[in-house]
Amino acid sequence: MVATPSTSSQTKGVVRQVIGPVLDVEFPAGKLPKILNALRIEAKNPAGQDIALTAEVQQLLGDHRVRAVAMSGTDGLVRGMEAIDTGAPISVPVGEATLGRIFNVLGEPVDEQGPVNTKDTAPIHRAAPKLTDLETKPKVFETGIKVIDLLAPYRQGGKVGLFGGAGVGKTVLIQELINNIAKEHGGVSVFGGVGERTREGNDLYEEFKESGVINADDLTQSKVALCFGQMNEPPGARMRVGLSALTMAEHFRDVNKQDVLLFVDNIFRFVQAGSEVSALLGRMPSAVGYQPTLGTDVGELQERITSTLEGSITSIQAVYVPADDLTDPAPATTFAHLDATTVLARALAAKGIYPAVDPLDSTSTMLQPSVVGDEHYKTARAVQSTLQRYKELQDIIAILGLDELSEEDRLTVDRARKIEKFLSQPFFVAEIFTGMSGKYVKLEDTIAGFNMILSGELDDLPEQAFYLVGNIDEVKAKAEKIKSEK
């Protein structure tokens, strides 16, 4: 959706050059559009087919010309076509009507569900909130997922990097977070699909419908809005779709005063698209061929994702690391903005531990006594040191067996296995697949449960009782059930 001002204020230009997704447009003297304004081209191509294209002004060239980047394919565009300056940046629909719908970078619905029932729109380019409007006190964002809340807690209004290969449970974890924020925090979510596969976007949409995150019968009951700019789209669309999703999230934060979850999959593709556009505009490449404006491009997006006094946007960003090189400028620049990292491990998924969050690799700046309190901090560190010791002993166990360990080490292994099992839990969104009802575990229950395992109070309970349960009361009930079945 693009702002369309009154006819009297419209300035008309003429397309003078088209090179791939980049076009040069000439305007009358003194009437050049501003940088970031949207240009609209509506015409018929030589074959008689309709063209409706939006482009964003990126450079002023001199000689009354501007250079713009197209948001869709430029096939059929010819020199001499009329381009209209809309007088404003690209705008997208915002508000409750966006929930349950799929949009493209321009805010046009692409789910064949008809037009969006709202007149509220907002420009995708805006300044980050003022420092005086920010919520500066760090506050933990409770997710109800034990392993995250205990070992790598999220910051409300913070940014989390989600690392994981294919098939380790990224999508299910994302769905559970969307479900939990809706039920426990009364919040909504926005999903920005940036430069990923169309098939994955379609699968995600179908899974959201299946798990109830999107209510196909009554869209007003849905908990998420989706905004996609996929791999096959021009770099302009992939570069801006993250901002379109963020704009929808900002409305829920600033106008509805809600806590919002913003998912970006994948933040690397946003950088990659910026690099392509930079090259098309003729800018000199910087380190490893990336755009010279890499830092500001990422910063402009990330600085808008924050907590204000009215509400918060907590962002979870999938991060692709090219060739597993963490020093690559794209992931390295992203890391500077992250408050926490959630790493999904294939080895845990293979053991059937879901969510497969790696308790030793996942980190958070929130895990410090001054923020989470002494009890939480000490429990988390004790859990990690127990698991680390178990990891060190695994080679010895594989070669010599458990019997060769000292009494103390055997006890450590026993407790570590219980901790590993207790870090798993059944998800609400997976109920239809597992047949087990989902669990939301309060932070105090999580801390109390792990303290009981570490102190040895539960040494006599079987390991299996700790697997896929919520709090410690369920462990005891499951242990009784196992005992009665023997």
Curated annotation (Swiss-Prot):
EC supergroup of this enzyme: translocase
InterPro entries for the chain: AAA+_ATPase, ATP-synt_VA_C, ATP_synth_F1_bsu, ATPase_a/bsu_AS, ATPase_alpha/beta_chains, ATPase_F1/V1/A1_a/bsu_N, ATPase_F1/V1/A1_a/bsu_N_sf, ATPase_F1/V1/A1_a/bsu_nucl-bd
Gene3D superfamilies in alphabetical order: 2.40.10.170, Bovine Mitochondrial F1-atpase, Atp Synthase Beta Chain, Chain D, domain 3, P-loop containing nucleotide triphosphate hydrolases
Membrane topology, record value: Peripheral membrane protein
Keywords, comma-separated and alphabetical: ATP synthesis, ATP-binding, CF(1), Hydrogen ion transport, Ion transport, Membrane, Nucleotide-binding, Thylakoid, Translocase, Transport
Entry EC number(s): 7.1.2.2
Pfam families: ATP-synt_ab, ATP-synt_ab_N, ATP-synt_VA_C
Ligand binding (ATP): G164, G165, A166, G167, V168, G169, K170, T171
Catalytic activity: ATP + H2O + 4 H(+)(in) = ADP + phosphate + 5 H(+)(out)
Principal subcellular localisation of the protein: membrane
Superkingdom in the source lineage: Bacteria
Entries under PANTHER family matching the protein: ATP SYNTHASE, ATP SYNTHASE SUBUNIT BETA, MITOCHONDRIAL
Quaternary structure annotation from Swiss-Prot or TrEMBL: F-type ATPases have 2 components, CF(1) - the catalytic core - and CF(0) - the membrane proton channel. CF(1) has five subunits: alpha(3), beta(3), gamma(1), delta(1), epsilon(1). CF(0) has four main subunits: a(1), b(1), b'(1) and c(9-12).
Family: Belongs to the ATPase alpha/beta chains family.
Protein name: ATP synthase subunit beta
